[in-house]
């Protein structure tokens, strides 16, 4: 389960955010925004909220600073950022104000989550189950799109009176899912109980929007679009065969046949083939599996062995 000190610190940070001026709209503005509306938290307010959460994530014992894996993930992240910029999804002000950093966790569960202000959490367990760089990039593109489309801010704009609890439940639920599915369910359920019914529908719309925008970013960045589909299918199959809580990503990003079909329909028509064997990715996935095991703190840099 999520460690008590971390949980307490996160709750304290979120409660502090509730009482700190964050540039929230007045209750009269508490209406469901259009999908193009980023109203809610200002850029600066969202960055400050994210910094509070990120500080605690950096302090958590599961946080890992492995230069080899960090460099590899960054090599996938940078082209996605460039593609989002070229497409107009990432404006100059948003790029300047947000952090755009990825935090790695040695957690063995399959999970990734966006944090306010441009941080993204990635579990080594997710990297370990992927078979290609394109599959990893598809997850990063999806989460990046949650950030560029200001989904957290728009959740806030939906009902500003419930902001601290809804945002807190969403963030803590995503993080707690990596430790205890039961705890995550309680947090998410609590957040939903505080929200209006429209918020659940809006969340589904957010997932579809992150799929569509993320798919475009993935393709623009030069990755194989089919990676989006194969990653979705991998997660869906895992959910059917294994409901032990090892795939918390599915709890916060529920897959539907509609979403998978939509992504497959976007893949360019023509013969499709599996991604060619990628030795570097295979090494990185293996490294992630080893480092996510208990008792292993560091590994030598084995990239030169591939040269």
Regions found by a protein language model. Give the residues of each.
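Extracytoplasmic and endomembrane cell-envelope/extracellular-matrix remodeling and assembly machinery
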Residues: 36-40, 51, 63, 71, ...
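Active-site His/Glu-centered metal-binding helix of metallohydrolases
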Residues: 53, 140-152, 213
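Solvent-exposed coil/turn segments that connect beta secondary-structure elements
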Residues: 78-79, 105-109, 117-119, 125-127, ...
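Catalytic Zn2+-binding segment of zinc metalloproteases
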Residues: 134, 144-161, 179
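Acidic/histidine metal-binding catalytic segments
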Residues: 156-168, 183-187, 222-232
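Membrane-active amphipathic alpha-helices enriched in small hydrophobic residues
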Residues: 164-179, 186-195
């Amino acid at each position: 389960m999520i460690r008590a000190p971390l949980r307490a610190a996160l709750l304290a940070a979120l409660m502090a955010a509730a009482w700190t001026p964050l540039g929230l709209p007045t209750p009269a503005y508490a209406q469901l925004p259009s999908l193009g509306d980023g109203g809610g938290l200002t850029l600066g307010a969202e960055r400050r909220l994210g910094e509070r959460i990120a500080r605690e994530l950096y302090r958590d014992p599961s946080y890992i600073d492995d230069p080899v894996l960090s460099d590899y993930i960054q090599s996938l992240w940078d082209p996605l950022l460039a593609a989002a910029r070229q497409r107009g999804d990432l404006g100059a002000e948003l790029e300047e104000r947000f952090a755009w950093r990825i935090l790695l966790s040695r957690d063995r569960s399959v999970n990734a989550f966006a944090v306010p202000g441009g941080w993204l959490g990635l579990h080594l367990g997710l990297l370990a189950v992927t078979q290609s760089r394109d599959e990893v990039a598809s997850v990063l593109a999806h989460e990046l799109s949650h950030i560029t489309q200001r989904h957290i801010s728009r959740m806030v704009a939906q009902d500003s009176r419930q902001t601290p609890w809804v945002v807190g439940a969403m963030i803590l639920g995503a993080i707690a899912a990596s430790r205890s599915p039961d705890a995550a369910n309680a947090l998410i359920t609590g957040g939903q109980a505080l929200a209006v019914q429209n918020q659940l529908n809006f969340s589904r719309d957010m997932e579809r929007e992150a799929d569509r925008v993320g798919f475009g970013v993935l393709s623009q960045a030069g990755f194989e679009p089919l990676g989006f589909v194969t990653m979705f299918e991998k997660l869906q199959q895992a959910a059917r065969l294994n409901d032990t809580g090892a795939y918390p990503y599915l709890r916060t990003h529920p897959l539907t046949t509609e979403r998978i079909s939509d992504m497959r329909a976007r893949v360019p028509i023509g013969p499709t083939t599996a991604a060619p064997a990628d030795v570097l990715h295979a090494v990185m996935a293996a490294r992630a599996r080893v480092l996510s095991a208990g008792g292993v703190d560091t590994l030598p840099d084995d990239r030169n062995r591939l040269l």
